[in-house]
């Protein structure tokens, strides 16, 4: 029996009402169908986008950092792919046995690992980055759900501590933190790429969406450094520091013709990829960041200024008797009474009195102008972090005693690198040339500070100073003529100078007629009773110069072994 034919129902329910209910239900199905069609056909891009927002991820494709090479193409720093581990906390299998083993393998305390996995609101958390391959294999074999592996890059430094202060290091994000790694971070780092993907709730990539942008690897960088010279210089410096129980030391070797830095070594040093217990003493690139009063290594510059201004000649006589001299109430002394010396003799014997009397023939401005021309008091123009300017006060503030002490290296400060750089004006026939950390085959062209003739005269004086009758005969080396100046400077303590703490210097060049290299050595606080630059720093200079010239295939210019003496004339300081 039909609904409309039932007498009971027909009397109680109007026909139009039942039809209305059926119509509403039918209309509902029509609306739902239309909406479904709209979503799937007309406006599907909006909902696809919403889905992507919830499950799409942009994966970074890491760029491989460029290599750092020495001048001969040997690797100083390179990147190797290494695995890193991350997790989706809410998905991690909490098996206590597996987590304990994971903690052991990754070297993470169990409490710390547990804390990392507690925040289940996070969809990504690093567990351990840059893990050794054998460890990564064992972690993978644990098969812990919710823990995943990603490829990253880690730097390797084959030369270790010998080149650490040159190369520097990167952090876990592969960003340069020190040295060349920091200076050229942008060029070495390249540009990472990206990949847009859809991931399921387990973090697995199920689909690529959009175009992949490939990474652009960093470019390789070739330095001027010769890794063999660098290693040898570091070894000899380390030996000297340990022998004399010194606090620290530095060596700088420059190519006198191109201005290239061939070696820059410091001790103490550090291993760049093992920095767990790194101290500030190890990290400091002392050759560039530490400034000192250079002592007698400034005397050749004082004499060169006087020669250039026509106030003296190499044979001008200077009376240094009786080995002391008073300037405005302050007494300047020599270690001996040298009597009357030629200007050459002032350098050879390292007379403070002689240097003072020569400086009195000059104006403060003449000295200051030349100091500025040689880079003193200015930050070195070299692409390297931490290089400092040193200190030279404006000449208008100089008192007579200050002008006097500056003539032999007190009252101003410079880094070892600045001292080596200033001597390019002697080695390069009077031109102060730019220096560079990058390889170049071009002979440098610089700013003329001294005439060729005066530069040659200074080189002759430096050869005398490094000879048997000078203060630095231990700088002499087999097969090559050398010239240089030793320096011994008392260290400042408070407002005065220590009577027991010294810095020993030696700065020079070889071969002397046409120098190919400049070498500067500084040893800080030798404490075994020997502290003169001619005894502590000069032997390091000798060994480094001889080995470097051999490595450069420079022909010896001495036919016989030089007369290397075992005693040194005491220098004034």
Where are these regions (language model features)?
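Beta-lactam-recognizing serine transpeptidase/beta-lactamase-like catalytic domain environment
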Residues: 2-6, 77, 199-210, 251-296, ...
